[in-house]
UniProtKB/Swiss-Prot annotation:
Residues 1-20 form the signal peptide. GO terms for cellular component: sarcoplasmic reticulum lumen; sarcoplasmic reticulum membrane. It comes from the Eukaryota. Residues 255-258 are annotated as: G4 motif. One of its GO terms (biological process) is store-operated calcium entry. This is Sarcalumenin. The lineage of its organism: Eukaryota, Metazoa, Chordata, Craniata, Vertebrata.
Amino acid sequence: MRALVLLGCLLASLLFSGQAEETEDANEEAPLRDRSHIEKTLMLNEDKPSDDYSAVLQRLRKIYHSSIKPLEQSYKYNELRQHEITDGEITSKPMVLFLGPWSVGKSTMINYLLGLENTRYQLYTGAEPTTSEFTVLMHGPKLKTIEGIVMAADSARSFSPLEKFGQNFLEKLIGIEVPHKLLERVTFVDTPGIIENRKQQERGYPFNDVCQWFIDRADLIFVVFDPTKLDVGLELEMLFRQLKGRESQIRIILNKADNLATQMLMRVYGALFWSLAPLINVTEPPRVYVSSFWPQEYKPDTHQELFLQEEISLLEDLNQVIENRLENKIAFIRQHAIRVRIHALLVDRYLQTYKDKMTFFSDGELVFKDIVEDPDKFYIFKTILAKTNVSKFDLPNREAYKDFFGINPISSFKLLSQQCSYMGGCFLEKIERAITQELPGLLGSLGLGKNPGALNCDKTGCSETPKNRYRKH
């Protein structure tokens, strides 16, 4: 009996190994696509002298620490927006974020762009939900895996603020260093697929908050869809709510397009726009790329030339982000400074109104509660709009200040007029000088303008709304 069992196991083993060999042979025989257009478009093979960005980045850090951060800390801006800027974030490479439902080809697309297929570097892929971690792909001299706890503890990296999401999340965060030329210029972030089944969504950490953290810091966001899975559920709706205000950075990708016939592809393209229309309330829709991002050749009798041109357009978008990394970084810090300035003006106005309404017999808590509950009665926001270079579109939500002052007593703040020193000057004047002169001047030093000093709020406005910084096709 034992001999029969052993014989059966041996036969099964031989059968399985034979199937595995056939599968490997099939994979080896599958024609691979020419990748030369990737290297050409991204200029990976060009021996260009590496630009020395360190001087500009050091100047940017100095402006932030000397002119912006003092006011930011004094008025506890981070507790309103929960976006703390670190030195690692200022000096970091552009970040490209991959989002979308499960098994739509996000990891496969990263493998394809980096040429990691059939190497020990490749990300695991499959038809089932395979990515349960946030995977950060960075450049390194050799293949190296970094635990999330180590990444969060390293202040030199831009991921130290992720520690606030708890140990359960850090166990789902992983960094991979790969010696690849593209990763010398950009960082890729692969994310867990969105699963509409609520029970499967019990991840043990604040998934949406973590996504928001990466969205706020991403320079380019690829939202990937599979043409056979276009269902838009609650989780996907939540994702697009988080993407509001980032429309200029979103690129929608209809992947695996060579699986469909022409007529069906047109129907799917229309269905995708129909499903996403209620979620993207902007005049100009995001760019949609239709292609198949994997190493195998396009299937026969499909629009191969179209798919290739779409892929090249996407690569040009990616290259624009890489080329404009310093310009985008300076613009990001300037937008942050504008928000900090408006927040400080609002807190100062709340405090001034509180002092004006207080009398010897007044109950301070009741007086300030009345101001916070109905700021329009005291013209808080209208007064700020009368200030120079403040747009109504930049004002924060009134409700946000109820929560803000709920944990920060008004008595803990000083008036802006009291935030001055003989040697250091006034906080407000320093941040306004950074917005109108120093940051535009730094931008002009990159050769973008003939008269950098002329770029100020009087001419350009201090709008916080991000412009479309990337070239559309």
